[in-house]
Amino acid sequence: MSEFIAENRGADAITRPNWSAVFSVAFCVACLIIVEFLPVSLLTPMAQDLGISEGVAGQSVTVTAFVAMFASLFITQTIQATDRCYVVILFAVLLTLSCLLVSFANSFSLLLIGRACLGLALGGFWAMSASLTMRLVPPRTVPKALSVIFGAVSIALVIAAPLGSFLGELIGWRNVFNAAAVMGVLCIFWIIKSLPSLPGEPSHQKQNTFRLLQRPGVMAGMIAIFMSFAGQFAFFTYIRPVYMNLAGFGVDGLTLVLLSFGIASFIGTSLSSFILKRSVKLALAGAPLILAVSALVLTLWGSDKIVATGVAIIWGLTFALVPVGWSTWITRSLADQAEKAGSIQVAVIQLANTCGAAIGGYALDNIGLTSPLMLSGTLMLLTALLVTAKVKMKKS
């Protein structure tokens, strides 16, 4: 690796895009997303094997999001001048280690340790993903490079849950994570081969990132982001027990539902730019309102498989607008501090994922099967009301 560590120290002066490096980063992103969501489709066998409830098993998603939240806030201060190439390799190693620890976990504690390793990689990577991509291509090619990265995210979201469900039935949930560890090893070798030296900056200006929250409408926006993602994770983390017990889906049927959800999400992401051109605020208020209605429909009529499948498709199609919409809100309303605002956004989303999965799991175990749906629908409705009343939007 020394030959490429020594070269191109002036990354900012890059004149030709390094597409191999961009695709290696995109592959790493896809692997992180896939492994993050594997427990969603493997929750029941994981819980049975470890002798815990499905609600407790769902906390494997919670701990990943919780650790990722802190990693996203503090990673840039921690790594400072460290070459970003080494940092990305470390994230790929943590991804691989996480999969192996989960695969060999004989207790809930070891499972959580493995998922915490994933949280470090996930939060740290997302905090620096945009700046990393921008250093691999010339300025004119940045949008195309970012589209490759986020395209990998969309593809990973499409295949993660149905692939986990299908392979889990075929080879067992532990071997699914062993297969994911192999993907992690491929990440390591591809990054070593393709990623150039990307020297870190010794220090950043000591500006208070959280002072951004004092700007008009920003705090309301972050609260809305929190509620929308908490609502998503309160429902999606427990989609397997809800759909298998409420609608009576078997493993094969659930796999098809999850695949439909993923395809709908991919289509929603593809259409999001067209919708957001019309009105970002309308999309940010309208999407959670549709999701709130969908949660109500599933609660009342979810025992019908056709209704349950339709709700999954509508949910995937609609929620796809949410992350793209809030990123657009940041680039328009906080363009002068987009990097700092993005860091706060990542932390808020991870905190929301933590709280949504945790409270949803508690509700599932202690209140009832449809309680995660009711929690999700309530949060989505509150999000729609808050966006309508308080969130400010600058025109592009």
From Swiss-Prot:
Reaction it catalyzes: inosine(in) + H(+)(out) = inosine(out) + H(+)(in); guanosine(in) + H(+)(out) = guanosine(out) + H(+)(in)
Membrane topology listed for this record: Multi-pass membrane protein
Protein task: Involved in the efflux of purine ribonucleosides, such as inosine and guanosine.
Source taxon at top rank: Bacteria
Gene that produces this protein: nepI
All ranges on the Cytoplasmic side of the membrane: 1-21, 76-85, 129-147, 197-215, 277-281, 327-343, 388-396
One GO MF term: antiporter activity
SUPFAM superfamilies linked: MFS general substrate transporter
Transmembrane feature ranges: 22-42, 55-75, 86-106, 108-128, 148-168, 176-196, 216-236, 256-276, 282-302, 306-326, 344-364, 367-387
Periplasmic side: 43-54, 107, 169-175, 237-255, 303-305, 365-366
CDD domains according to UniProt: MFS_NepI_like
Cited PANTHER family: PURINE EFFLUX PUMP PBUE, PURINE RIBONUCLEOSIDE EFFLUX PUMP NEPI
Family, per entry: Belongs to the major facilitator superfamily. DHA1 family. NepI (TC 2.A.1.2.26) subfamily.
GO CC annotation terms, alphabetical: plasma membrane
InterPro entries, A to Z: MFS (IPR011701), MFS_dom (IPR020846), MFS_Efflux_Transporters (IPR050189), MFS_NepI (IPR023680), MFS_trans_sf (IPR036259)
Identification of the protein by name: Purine ribonucleoside efflux pump NepI
Keywords associated with the record: Antiport, Cell inner membrane, Cell membrane, Membrane, Transmembrane, Transmembrane helix, Transport
Localization: Cell inner membrane
Major place of residence: membrane
